[in-house]
From Swiss-Prot:
<dbReference type="InterPro" id="IPR031157">
    <property type="entry name" value="G_TR_CS"/>
</dbReference>
<dbReference type="Pfam" id="PF00009">
    <property type="entry name" value="GTP_EFTU"/>
</dbReference>
<dbReference type="InterPro" id="IPR005225">
    <property type="entry name" value="Small_GTP-bd"/>
</dbReference>
<feature type="binding site">
    <location>
        <begin position="140"/>
        <end position="143"/>
    </location>
    <ligand>
        <name>GTP</name>
    </ligand>
</feature>
<dbReference type="InterPro" id="IPR027417">
    <property type="entry name" value="P-loop_NTPase"/>
</dbReference>
<keyword id="KW-0547">Nucleotide-binding</keyword>
<dbReference type="GO" id="GO:0005829">
    <property type="term" value="C:cytosol"/>
</dbReference>
<dbReference type="GO" id="GO:0016150">
    <property type="term" value="F:translation release factor activity, codon nonspecific"/>
</dbReference>
<dbReference type="InterPro" id="IPR004548">
    <property type="entry name" value="PrfC"/>
</dbReference>
<dbReference type="Pfam" id="PF16658">
    <property type="entry name" value="RF3_C"/>
</dbReference>
<keyword id="KW-0342">GTP-binding</keyword>
<keyword id="KW-0648">Protein biosynthesis</keyword>
<dbReference type="GO" id="GO:0005525">
    <property type="term" value="F:GTP binding"/>
</dbReference>
<comment type="similarity">
    <text>Belongs to the TRAFAC class translation factor GTPase superfamily. Classic translation factor GTPase family. PrfC subfamily.</text>
</comment>
<dbReference type="InterPro" id="IPR032090">
    <property type="entry name" value="RF3_C"/>
</dbReference>
<comment type="function">
    <text>Increases the formation of ribosomal termination complexes and stimulates activities of RF-1 and RF-2. It binds guanine nucleotides and has strong preference for UGA stop codons. It may interact directly with the ribosome. The stimulation of RF-1 and RF-2 is significantly reduced by GTP and GDP, but not by GMP.</text>
</comment>
<dbReference type="Pfam" id="PF22042">
    <property type="entry name" value="EF-G_D2"/>
</dbReference>
Length: 534
């Protein structure tokens, strides 16, 4: 086996997806804690204290207590290297989360035991479906009263359309919580309350028949449990590795992240069964992770990760080959050779200079405005990774300055923020308006906050008569020009120089589509096909 094959086989790159408040950031912390990456988990509840959760590091996030930007954390575990990509927890950040899901090989879905499958989880699941991403499920907050576990499995199967294979099963919940049974190994992990923030090893009995177990959980509960397990094992699916890796079955675990409970069995199972880096599609061919030459794509751009150094960092997922510090690569979109010096690896906000990286790893490349989302880097081959779309925004605002002299800073700020995916930015052909598009209202708050904080620009966002946007393409240049002339009042250019139809109403969009049958109106735009613009 080559060194690349060896290292790729050790990698497990995944993201955690959930509805806001299902306990995702807490679980992220606990995985890092069990992985030995942090000594003390900064519980999200302790916000007011100095101990902020390690993965929420932007000032706005610390103020609001939600993860707005996705961060990347790497830790070794049981001979494997785990790359955990945290995703924004707030409902408005669908697009950023979507892009993170393009960079992972599997996902972990967190569900609140009391609330079950929620709206945001359904949306994220749809995104995972597009790529058949393998998914494990952690049903969290078992220390509180919640829905019946059998009903929860049924809900996941019905609402999300994926088969459930329970791997651990709860012994009671809320006040009566006694532990979980591992359905594959037969072990019983006891629940011992204690919100200590250091690694906690629970008491484990080898089986339900082990001496001493009945004293711990009581005869009645043990009898109820045996009955329930018979029912569960008769009615549910046994774990099937191929079905899981094909995205058709989800192994299910129960636990309480805040109490460090049930996390260890999940992590052990994850590193053993989750897929290593997979084959990736490009515009020209399929790229295997074990290829000797480096290739990778940018799935996120983050401005000002370091307030001391007003910098921007492009997050690149390595897809094949080996990255070494200072190596020369081809930036495919611009056709220029770029030396990747001082690339970073991440442990949330702590950065270290990366000496090397392998398939599945994520590195940070310093970006001075030349790198965009979806850009591909190779060792010379001209190919572009596909499947990293921009979604048509659902909300629009016009940016207006309180101080008209700051126009240049506003344009620069909006261009940079749209490049990193915080918002989308459109310029109508027939006016000097600057129109922002977003998937949710909070995005506008974040942009306003960052414009003020990072660019010194005080901007107001006003309503604008745009309901939806579609990217327009036509194979016949003459017909496109005709369409452009007739519809100039509703057309604009996005930050990448692409033509966009800004529809004032859904009816208007429908009419425009009927009147121009040769023009394609798309609700998404592939990043891989973006032209370079100044």
């Amino acid at each position: 086996m080559s060194e690349v094959s060896n290292e790729a086989a050790r990698r497990r790159t995944f993201a955690i997806i959930s509805h806001p408040d299902a306990g995702k950031t807490t679980l992220t912390e606990k995985l890092l804690l069990f992985g030995g990456a942090i000594q003390m988990a900064g519980s999200v509840k302790g916000r007011k204290a100095a101990r902020h959760a390690t993965s929420d590091w932007m000032a706005l996030e610390k103020e609001r207590g939600i993860s707005v930007t996705s961060s990347v954390m790497q830790f070794p575990y049981e001979g494997k290297i785990v790359n955990l990509l945290d995703t924004p927890g707030h409902a408005d950040f669908g697009e950023d989360t979507y892009r993170v899901l393009t960079a992972v090989d599997s996902a972990l879905m967190v569900i609140d035991v009391a609330k079950g499958v929620e709206e945001r989880t359904i949306k994220l699941m749809e995104v995972c479906r597009l790529r058949d991403t393998p998914i494990m499920t952690f049903i969290n907050k078992l220390d509180r009263e919640g829905k019946n576990p059998i009903d929860l499995l049924d809900e996941v199967e019905t609402v999300l359309g994926i088969q459930c294979a329970p791997v651990t099963w709860p012994i009671g919940m809320g006040q009566r919580l006694k532990g979980v049974v591992h359905l594959i190994s037969g072990e019983v992990h006891l629940y011992e309350q204690g919100r200590n923030f250091t690694r906690q090893d629970s008491t484990i009995f080898p089986s339900l028949d082990a001496p001493g177990l009945v004293e711990k959980i009581g005869e009645q509960m043990l009898a109820e449990l045996r009955e329930e397990l018979e029912l569960v094992q008769g009615a549910s699916n046994p774990f099937d590795l191929d079905a899981y890796r094909a995205g058709q079955q989800t192994p299910v675990f129960f636990g309480s992240g805040v109490n460090n409970f049930g996390v260890q069995p999940l992590l052990d199972f994850f590193v053993e069964h989750a897929p290593p880096p997979q084959t990736r599609e490009t515009t020209g061919r399929r790229v295997e992770p074990t290829e000797a030459k480096l290739s990778g794509f940018v799935f996120k751009i983050q401005a000002n990760m370091d307030p001391q150094h007003r910098d921007r960092v492009a997050f690149m997922r390595v897809c094949s080959g080996k990255f070494t510090a200072g190596m020369k690569t081809l930036h495919v979109r611009s056709g220029k050779d770029v030396k990747l010096a001082n690339a970073l690896t991440f442990m949330a906000s702590d950065r270290e200079i990366a000496a090397e990286a392998w398939p599945g790893d994520v590195i940070g490349i310093h970006n001075h405005g030349t790198i965009s989302i979806g850009d591909t880097f190779t060792e010379g081959e001209s190919l572009s990774f596909t499947g990293i779309p921009n979604f048509a925004p659902e909300l629009f605002r016009r940016a207006r300055l309180r101080d008209p002299l700051k126009l240049k800073q506003l344009q620069k700020g909006l261009a940079q923020l749209s490049e990193e995916g915080a918002t989308q930015f459109f310029r109508p052909l027939m006016s000097n308006d600057l129109i922002l598009g977003a998937v949710g209202v909070l995005q506008f708050d974040v942009v306003a906050y960052r414009l003020k904080d990072e660019y010194g620009v005080d901007a107001i966002f006003e309503p604008v008569s745009v309901t939806t946007a579609r990217w327009v393409h036509c194979d016949n240049p003459k017909k496109l020009e005709e369409f452009r002339e007739k519809n100039a009042g509703n057309l604009g250019i996005d930050a990448a120089g692409e033509l966009v139809y800004l529809a004032p109403t859904r009816v208007n969009l429908q009419l425009a589509q009927e009147r121009a049958p040769d023009v394609r109106f798309s609700a998404t735009r592939e990043h891989a096909h973006v032209k370079a613009v100044d």
